Amino acid sequence: MNAKIVVLPGDGIGPEVTAEAVRVLEAVARRGGHALSFTERLMGGCSIDAHGTALTPEVLADCQAADAVLLGAVGGPKWDDPRAKVRPEQGLLGLRKGLGVFANLRPVRVHPSLLDSSPLRPEKLRGVDIMVIRELTGGLYFGQPKGRDVKDGHARAVDTLEYQDFEVRRVVELAFRIAKGRKKKVTSVDKANVLESSRLWRELATAIGQANPDVALDHMLVDTAAMRLVTSPATLDVVVTENMFGDILTDEASVLAGSMGMLPSASIGEQGPGLYEPIHGSAPDIAGKGIANPVGTVLSAALLLRHSLGLEPEAAAIERAVDQTITDGCRTADLGGKLSTRAMADEILKRLA
């Protein structure tokens, strides 16, 4: 297979972890006889410094023309002024919109060797294997009208929570397709006791559930879901929810694994390139020290192979190598170990079958 991958290292530790993920992808490609080409481009704070914008039209066009996009991280204190007109995160939102991705997939699996690394008791974590699917293009983050003004002498801010039926259907249908390859259970999270948009969401999810009787569907209010994630996470399989709820719940779920550096994500649409990135931030406090955990980015590369290139054996090989590396006791600083970013990737490469 020939494939073009755009790499957006971004800010902070982004360049360090993406470099190791590219090494792993190159190794897998050599073994499988695939020709993967990698092109690096600027996005985020580094792009603001160089071009005055977080995402240039040229970089977006390159990403749209690629087979997949691998992202490191964006943002940092240098650009962290909420009053700024240009912020690194705008690049990420623009990229998602430009690529047409509508669903963010975040697998959360607790490795048996890392049960003691989580703030939760080990007995609550055994068997945790969750796929959280977050809708990406609707809701409060994109609804209009949006803005600030003065009304009756008082400052006012407005955000709009809006969903159209097709936006809900496509992400819930994706959740059911994914569930059929797992434990055949979907939990749809909403706030239908208060929000009209959540009532529409629940109605549509119910209809999709009726059309897929082989998959169990249950509805859960978002506050209950937040509690379930820390009281009995092993009871959850595929969780699907709207944009802001998903943003919050996925960050909560990330602590289950013991370190945010362990977890990958994939943002996919109906067609076109997917966007793959670790869930952690730019971690400016450790940037340049060579101690960041590359596992989340390496596992994001595995998702890239699976969802954008259709290379399931190669994706599974990376995941097995990561599992064995963790089982063998290899750890970066976030997990109480001493391995550098490069050394951790070296250990993964040694175990690639």
UniProtKB/Swiss-Prot annotation:
Site, as annotated: Important for catalysis: 141, 191
The protein's required cofactors: Mg(2+); Mn(2+)
Chloroplast listed as a keyword: no
Gene (UniProt): leuB
Role this protein plays: Catalyzes the oxidation of 3-carboxy-2-hydroxy-4-methylpentanoate (3-isopropylmalate) to 3-carboxy-4-methyl-2-oxopentanoate. The product decarboxylates to 4-methyl-2 oxopentanoate.
GO biological process: L-leucine biosynthetic process
Pathway(s) of this molecule: Amino-acid biosynthesis; L-leucine biosynthesis; L-leucine from 3-methyl-2-oxobutanoate: step 3/4
Protein name: 3-isopropylmalate dehydrogenase
